[in-house]
């Protein structure tokens, strides 16, 4: 029950267990939280001076056992400070707090309920802070890490009703870059000349040729009709001559 308490109780106890002594134990909780930094090489003097004199004054065997545990934990504490095992030290602090509360409750001294409530509130506050930090880290990791294998949906189609703005105009204030050089290897489009677009001209010429062909066809048809009429007239004349000759 009284093991691992050297981190909190840095001073020797009074010869007998009395109520003011247990109240002083609660004051030492605050000092236990103020641990030295890892970079500091100095260690707190936790040695128990003249333990034989104190043991002779203590009558209870539980008190003697408590001092023996302090002597044993003195060497362990120094080793932990040298090695820098902070996680184990924090676990030791929590256990020592629990043991000190048990000592106070056993001695029936001090306001136990208030001390228990304060410790419970501190632990709750620490847990709430840890949860907040964890949530913030999760959000940061989600934003930082995106799925590289995620691709766009190939089945996603463009809106067919979406049209370009026909009134979109060029910037009249936009100027050409004087330092920009022309590409000497770039060839001009033969269909684009100063005289205009050749494609349009070709279309016009083709239409004209079609019109000419149609006109020729119409002329030929008219000539054919005339020729037929002339041939019929000649036939009629010949027939009339033959009839006259027969009558004579």
Curated annotation (Swiss-Prot):
Tissue specificity annotation: Expression limited to post-meiotic male germ cells. Expressed in elongated spermatids during individualization and in finally elongated nuclei of spermatids. After completion of nuclear shaping it is no longer expressed in the sperm heads with the onset of individualization.
8 X 6 AA tandem repeat of D-P-C-K-K-K: annotated span: 147-194
GO biological process assignments: sperm individualization; spermatogenesis
Keyword Coiled coil: yes
Main location: nucleus
Segments of this protein annotated with the region Disordered: 146-200
Keyword set, alphabetical order: Coiled coil, Mitochondrion, Nucleus, Repeat
Record's subcellular location: Nucleus; Mitochondrion
Parts forming coiled coils: 82-147, 197-244
Positions of Sequence repeats: 147-152, 153-158, 159-164, 165-170, 171-176, 177-182, 183-188, 189-194
A GO CC term attached to the entry: mitochondrion
Role: May be involved in the final steps of mitochondrial differentiation within the flagellum.
Protein name from the UniProt record: Sperm-specific protein Don juan
Natural source organism: Drosophila melanogaster (Fruit fly)
Gene transcribed to yield this protein: dj
